[in-house]
């Protein structure tokens, strides 16, 4: 019998959650991570599944995700502990045939349930499936320190925030030319913040929750982690720059345009226009 804890997707979740913990992005039970799978990914591990999978209804049906398996982090679980006990802190779930709920096939032992932000994740998965023709498979939420810090001092506007991050590090425009969506402050763990996040995910692979954290989307765990890491590195540079009295010189609009042309990306027009 193959052990599911040795599968690429469990091992990938262990690495991503451990790396995020070591970065300082996921204190206590902060942060959550979901990865969309295919039936072929989980088929070799059916002998590991619960004999009687628990069923949990969704707060709203999501027919686009019908019959789709995911691996998810658990509610109240600490990222630092995933590596110690994957079955207690992660779960493989599968949405039912009408998208009204899901079964917990593996993991989330001792009656644990998926992250409280699952509505935000699933709604964002729906939008990124449509926006990327199914390429994006990962939604990651974390409390990236410097990005959060900037939401207290920068105007919480997509164009303004995006332009500052592009100027903070040359690679940013190449990595997220679509910019950073920003919400108003909202209560987490609700359908409302999930819907607002998903709406921004139609246009952006990064969405900031002011005074709270960031959501990122990508095709793989590495791509998604790298996306957030790149934005966070720029935010760290900006925090240092602002603390030293602000910018005396920076990347110009003309240079940003040249950068986009060189790497074949189309920068967010509203950010470029500032």
Curated annotation (Swiss-Prot):
Give EC number(s), comma-separated.
Answer: 4.1.2.19
Show the catalytic activity: L-rhamnulose 1-phosphate = (S)-lactaldehyde + dihydroxyacetone phosphate
The record, for SUPFAM superfamilies, names: AraD/HMP-PK domain-like
User: What does the record give as the active site?
Assistant: 117
One Pfam family cited in the UniProt record for this chain: Aldolase_II
GO terms for biological process? pentose catabolic process; rhamnose catabolic process
How does the cofactor attach, per the note?
Answer: Binds 1 zinc ion per subunit.
Keyword flag RNA-binding: no
Ordered alphabetically, the record's keywords are:
Cytoplasm, Lyase, Metal-binding, Rhamnose metabolism, Zinc
Q: Which residues bind Zn(2+)?
A: 141, 143, 212
Q: In which pathway does it act?
A: Carbohydrate degradation; L-rhamnose degradation; glycerone phosphate from L-rhamnose: step 3/3
A GO MF term: metal ion binding
Keyword Cytoplasm applies: yes
Which cofactors does it use?
Zn(2+)
Any single GO CC term annotated in Swiss-Prot or TrEMBL for this entry = cytosol
Its primary localisation, in coarse terms, equals: cytoplasm
Location comes to: Cytoplasm
Family in the record: Belongs to the aldolase class II family. RhaD subfamily.
Quaternary structure, per UniProt, is: Homotetramer.
Function field: Catalyzes the reversible cleavage of L-rhamnulose-1-phosphate to dihydroxyacetone phosphate (DHAP) and L-lactaldehyde.
Q: List the HAMAP family.
A: RhaD
From the Swiss-Prot or TrEMBL record, give the protein name.
Rhamnulose-1-phosphate aldolase
**Can you name the source organism?**
Escherichia coli O139:H28 (strain E24377A / ETEC)
